[in-house]
């Protein structure tokens, strides 16, 4: 029997620019495997709205795969146990997948799969994606590697060898308990977490949003990205399609570069200057997207522990007190008594998306003003984000909580943000219509006093010699190598980048 090439699709539901699929197709007949893993989908950073989006991506992926003759097996169960069922049914195979930089549990799962492969003599070939570098020796090389990968040609949909009669017969013998003949596992989750304003999943939708943004919809991107009321139509909205792999990051970067070249030639066009500014800004954010995912790849524990040792234990890391539970629930439900904060939370609940500045304000408010530990609030936000990307989410959560040691400490004034980003109050009126009525709650915290206490404590932690040395170590591992920053400075380095508005 010809050795089968099994491609394990995870957060990479596409056929184009798929290195693992391309590599597998050059070695022999290919079968695709997509797995609903109950243990991962039940984690506190997973949600039904994410499952709904993934299911839509998967449905479109399955149709596209059928058109090119790619057999797609959809299974429900845990890895690597499912691989054992597969091996018993068809014999030895070669496993292919993309490298994944996910949460801690997916990292542990991959280690179990690797152990299983080694024990059974199964070769597992992992291909890079998201331009994250495994076993990166130094950050000094990262930007160069990123550029090299971005310039490589995108991979086309590969031609596939037909499956032999023997393989078809072996695949048909797989037990029913192994296979899902529909998308019910994801649908069950989706039914429990309705998100009426979210985008529809699938590659076609992702291409539509990217193309419309590059063709002119992004003209006010730079001007409108900071306000929750104007960012929704002005941002690209491709983040969930990148997160779940309907689009590759290289596709997005190369399409953006092509669009920039085209707009440079549109002399006299009334949108030319603004579009060029917007597209340059957008491309830089695609770069920074990979930069932050690299942080989690290099240090998976960022999801679990404060990066800077001096900040460990400054917030309650045990079970929440009754007071903390009350504060947390008010924040989660959008009933803090601060209208702009509440409006942003309710918008996020409805849409599954929020512009970056307001995401930062929500977590900063919870961490600095309410002084809640970022793990509890980070999990809640992760569930709400359809575009939840662990490699961006957890480093950003720590950044806004002041626990990285290398980023400037951001404490947003919610009233100033309301004045700056919603000057006429239209956004608040839309999402917190009761804010001017007698029944609306009083603020759960004095935001000026709480911000002052947080600022003094966090900056105070950075003043010791030990803290400064620890910051230098963190910067060497994770900091941007921008020419304006000097890692040899006697002062603790400050990585000021922190803007993500896709």
Show the residue positions of the predicted features.
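Helix-hairpin-helix/helix-loop-helix acidic hairpins
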Residues: 325-347
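Trp/Phe/Arg-rich N-terminal binding region typifying the photolyase-homology
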Residues: 1-165, 272, 346-347, 395-396, ...
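Charged/polar, low-hydrophobicity segments characteristic of intrinsically disordered regions
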Residues: 294-304, 321-329, 391-414, 488-492
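A general alpha-helix detector
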Residues: 95, 237-238, 252, 343-344, ...
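Structured ligand/cofactor/substrate-binding pocket environments in proteins
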Residues: 277-294, 345-398
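Active-site-adjacent bridging/hinge elements
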Residues: 225-229, 319, 332-338
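C-terminal, helix-dominated tail/subdomain
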Residues: 310-319, 369, 380-450
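Glycine/tryptophan-enriched, flexible segments
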Residues: 122, 141-310, 314, 418-502
């Amino acid at each position: 029997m010809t050795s089968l090439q099994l491609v394990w699709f995870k957060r990479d539901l596409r056929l184009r620019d798929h290195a693992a699929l391309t590599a597998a197709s050059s070695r022999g007949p290919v079968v695709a495997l997509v797995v609903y893993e109950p243990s991962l989908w039940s984690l506190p950073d997973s949600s039904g709205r994410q499952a709904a989006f993934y299911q839509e991506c998967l449905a479109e992926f399955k149709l596209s795969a059928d058109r090119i003759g790619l057999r797609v097996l959809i299974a429900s169960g845990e890895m690597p146990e499912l691989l054992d069922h597969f091996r018993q049914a068809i014999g030895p195979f070669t496993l292919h997948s993309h490298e994944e930089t996910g949460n801690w549990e997916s990292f542990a799962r991959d280690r179990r799969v690797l152990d299983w492969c080694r024990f059974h003599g199964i070769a597992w070939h992992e291909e890079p994606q998201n331009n994250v570098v495994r076993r990166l020796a130094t950050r000094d090389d990262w930007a160069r590697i990123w550029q090299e990968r971005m310039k490589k040609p995108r991979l086309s949909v590969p031609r596939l060898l037909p499956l032999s009669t023997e393989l078809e017969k072996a695949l048909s013998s797989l037990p029913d308990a192994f296979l899902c003949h529909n998308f019910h596992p994801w649908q069950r989750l989706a039914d429990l977490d309705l998100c009426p304003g979210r985008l529809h999943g699938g590659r076609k939708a992702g291409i539509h949003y990217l193309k419309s943004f590059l063709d002119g919809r992004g003209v006010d991107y730079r001007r409108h990205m900071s306000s929750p009321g104007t960012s929704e139509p002005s941002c690209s909205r491709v983040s969930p399609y990148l997160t779940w792999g309907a689009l590759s990051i290289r596709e997005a970067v190369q399409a953006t570069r092509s669009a920039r070249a085209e707009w440079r030639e549109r002399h006299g066009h009334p949108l030319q200057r603004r579009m060029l500014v917007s597209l340059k800004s957008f491309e830089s954010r695609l770069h920074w997207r990979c930069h932050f995912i690299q942080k989690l790849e290099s240090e998976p524990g960022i999801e679990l522990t404060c990066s800077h040792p001096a900040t460990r234990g400054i917030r309650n890391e045990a079970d929440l007190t009754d007071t903390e539970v009350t504060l947390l629930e008010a924040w989660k439900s959008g009933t803090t008594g601060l209208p702009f904060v509440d409006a942003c939370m309710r918008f996020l609940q409805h849409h599954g998306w929020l512009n970056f500045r307001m995401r930062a304000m929500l977590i900063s408010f919870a961490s600095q003003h309410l002084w809640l530990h970022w793990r509890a609030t980070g999990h809640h936000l992760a569930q709400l984000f359809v575009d939840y990307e662990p490699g961006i989410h957890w480093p950003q959560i720590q950044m806004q909580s002041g626990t990285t040691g290398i980023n400037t400490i951001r404490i947003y004034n919610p009233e100033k943000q309301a004045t700056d980003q919603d000057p006429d109050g239209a956004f608040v009126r839309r999402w917190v219509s009761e804010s001017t009525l007698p029944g609306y709650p009083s603020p759960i915290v004095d935001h000026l006093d709480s911000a002052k206490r947080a600022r003094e404590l966090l900056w105070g932690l950075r003043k010791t010699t030990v803290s400064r040395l620890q910051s230098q170590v963190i910067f060497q591992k994770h900091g941007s190598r921008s020419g304006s920053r000097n890692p040899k400075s006697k002062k603790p380095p400050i990585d000021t980048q922190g803007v993500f508005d896709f």
